[in-house]
């Protein structure tokens, strides 16, 4: 089995997650939003909510589920970044929501095997 680049796996997963959300009726506002605190993979509007999405992509579950990588520290960081985004945007009236999307890829071809969307993950 060939070794796959983590950055490539991550970017493939984020692209798949954005397409998945778009098909479900979400309007993608930002991809890889960055500020001094860090980065949020996807920011989207859905009905009356502004949704902040952490995408975790894996080619194997040998080291645990993708969502397990979003620990309390990571969650707190995402919340702080979301606060920065909301404060500097026109979306203050929207209810914030924090989701995780797990993307499972075939380790050989990096093709989609499964998407698991965890709503209100934290």
From Swiss-Prot:
Which InterPro entries does its entry note?
A: Restrct_endonuc-II-like, tRNA_endonuc-like_dom_sf, UPF0102_YraN-like
Q: Which Pfam families match?
A: UPF0102
Q: Which domain of life is it from?
A: Bacteria
Q: Mark the transmembrane ranges.
A: none
UniProt GO MF annotations: nucleic acid binding
Which NCBIfam families does this one have?
A: PRK12497.1-3, PRK12497.3-3, YraN family protein
Family according to the record: Belongs to the UPF0102 family.
Q: What name does the UniProt record give this protein?
A: UPF0102 protein TTE1452
Q: What is the lineage of its organism?
A: Bacteria, Bacillati, Bacillota, Clostridia, Thermoanaerobacterales
């Amino acid at each position: 089995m060939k070794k796959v680049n983590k950055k490539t796996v991550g970017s493939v997963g984020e692209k798949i997650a954005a397409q998945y959300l778009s098909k479900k009726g979400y309007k993608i506002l930002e991809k890889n939003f960055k500020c001094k605190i860090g980065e949020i993979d996807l920011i989207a509007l859905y009905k009356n909510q502004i949704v902040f999405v952490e995408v975790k992509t894996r080619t194997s579950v040998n080291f645990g589920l993708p969502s397990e990588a979003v620990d309390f520290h990571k969650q707190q960081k995402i919340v702080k970044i979301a606060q920065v985004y909301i404060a500097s945007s026109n979306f203050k009236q929207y209810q914030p929501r924090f989701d995780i999307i797990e993307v499972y890829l075939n380790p050989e071809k990096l093709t989609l095997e499964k998407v698991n969307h965890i709503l209100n993950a934290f």
